[in-house]
Amino acid sequence: MKIISKNKNFIVNEEIRQKEVRVIGDDGSQLGVIPTSEALKLAEEKELDLVAMSPNAVPPVCKIMDFGKFVYEQTKKEKENKKNQKIVNVKEVRLSASIEEHDVQIKSNNARKFLIAGDKVKVAVRFRGRQTDYAFKGRKILDNFFEKINDVGVIEKPAKLEGKNMIMILAPKKA
């Protein structure tokens, strides 16, 4: 079987240039250090491929296996791992320094929905003009905001003044 690898991560069959290789059989047994030509013959007899698993080792470690099946299983594992990853979005809720209580309630309900959905929430109080002199009001607003949703979220990054915004990041509570 003459397969030349399309997958550039592995060196297969005739692409192996070293004189001697350490060979692992298709059943996982150690066959020892043998010449590459002999290892290729062993692989051909079993109608399998000789794949360099760690080409940088001295001598390189090669395994006799079905390369097509191996690549298929690798891609299948990668897809499975990708499927299991959870992408966490950061949603932003903007408040002003002079926000009314009812508006805070509405914004906190939106943030609650985001946290329940598993997203992080960035809460920003925006200061205009001289309002930055009264940053303590922004901290009060953020504390009040957090009190309304502390049953579904935790503070990941506490309130901090960054430029003209006071920002706090909330994360969903672990169940």
Swiss-Prot record:
Keyword Cytoplasm set for record: yes
Family matches, as InterPro entries: T_IF-3_C_sf, T_IF-3_N_sf, Translation_initiation_fac3_CS, Translation_initiation_fac_3, Translation_initiation_fac_3_C, Translation_initiation_fac_3_N
Coiled-coil parts of chain: none
Keywords: Cytoplasm, Initiation factor, Protein biosynthesis
Subcellular location as annotated: Cytoplasm
Cross-referenced Pfam families: IF3_C, IF3_N
Taxonomy, superkingdom: Bacteria
Subunit (UniProt): Monomer.
Family to which this protein belongs: Belongs to the IF-3 family.
Protein name: Translation initiation factor IF-3
Native species: Clostridium acetobutylicum (strain ATCC 824 / DSM 792 / JCM 1419 / IAM 19013 / LMG 5710 / NBRC 13948 / NRRL B-527 / VKM B-1787 / 2291 / W)
Lineage, highest ranks first: Bacteria, Bacillati, Bacillota, Clostridia, Eubacteriales
Gene name of this polypeptide: infC
